[in-house]
Amino acid sequence: MQTGDFVNHAGMRANNTMTFYGQEKVAYNAQLCLMNMAVHGLTGRIKSGDEANTFYHDAHNLNGKCDYVMANPPFNVDKVKAESAEAADRLPFGMPAINKNKEVSNANYLWISYFYSYLNDHGRAGFVMPSSATDSSRKDKDIREALIKTGHVDVIISVANNFFYTKSLPCTLWFFDKRKSEELQDKVLFIDARNYYTVVDRTLNEWSDWQLKNLNAIVWLYRGETDEYRELISDYYTALESDDDFASIKDALEKKIQDKQKEAKEAVEAAKRKEKKVVQAKFDEEIAALDEKLTIAKEAIWLTEKFGEGIYADIPGLCKVADRKTILEEKGASLTPGAYVGVAPEEDDGVDFTERMKEIHQELLELQKESNELMNTISKNMEEMGL
């Protein structure tokens, strides 16, 4: 549904520009899918039943035919019949590990193989995997090595906890690209976004629209697509309704919010009792609008402090471009972003440690003195009371 919304938002009609295919073993789930698509004005070819079990059948004969593959498969599926899975083909890098019961006990690399296999010669894929899949061992590692050698692994992004309603564990986004430019064939972009997100509530995180744009911007610059980056910077200025530098805009917004909060407090105190809630609601709405702009300004600063006018750079703790030799020989074919980007340097808060410790020590001495004086006063009062 979101893919259709994305295409429609871009000015194209999803039903005219895309063909949606799906297969699902459980018929009820397939019916839900069709109903959901109909509600959103989309149509699709969805097959269901045993003949639509993805592990054992390519129900639409899509192997090698897809321009784009997007997927959020179930993680760590077990008890997949190895013989049936192998007979269904779509395994360009071979079978994952098979247990004594002749089953695949973890199907993550079956999914990865399928997504790659479905692509045509210029296809692209993007999908979600558990974080463990980026450096799992044994046969998984063999498949991963073969995959890396193709030069089609494009971007790997680590995602924080709580991005799914049903799973709290961190995950990883994988992107394949069979039409990578010649200069990028030997490279993979790693992004560690585990510390970059917006908290929705105690159990759910997400990327805001501007955060998604910022992550896209990193990929654009990696690919040399600087026009898209400049357009995003222009969008920031438009949203902020100012031509000042982003830091100045941020400072001005913070000042406006402080002033508005002070004004709200005074207005509520001066309002009649029955009008207080109405007055407060009016100011809350105005402050929320300013807060939204402040958030946008902070995201603009986050991006431009790292990439300036639009030149890609490896940022410790955030992003790193690595070549295949480094990945295969130095990192043991690991695709874990954290193994490449490292740790972000701690920000200098401008406080001299020695001087601050002296200040704290002096504060403690003064507090101790006040405490002693208070105890003496209490003791004296108790004596006067004959206690």
Locations of the language-model features?
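Amphipathic alpha-helical/coiled-coil segments positioned at domain termini
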Residues: 327-351, 355
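Conserved S-adenosyl-L-methionine
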Residues: 1-71, 76-87, 94, 98, ...
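Short, contiguous acidic/charged loop-to-helix segments that flank catalytic cores in large enzymes
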Residues: 80-106, 131-139, 160-166, 202-210, ...
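Amphipathic alpha-helical coiled-coil segments
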Residues: 353, 357-378
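Conserved Class I SAM-dependent methyltransferase catalytic core
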Residues: 30, 100-176
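Active-site lining segments that contact anionic ligands and/or coordinate catalytic metals
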Residues: 65-66, 88, 106-107, 122-128, ...
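Flexible, glycine-/basic-rich loop-and-beta segments that form/coincide
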Residues: 165-329
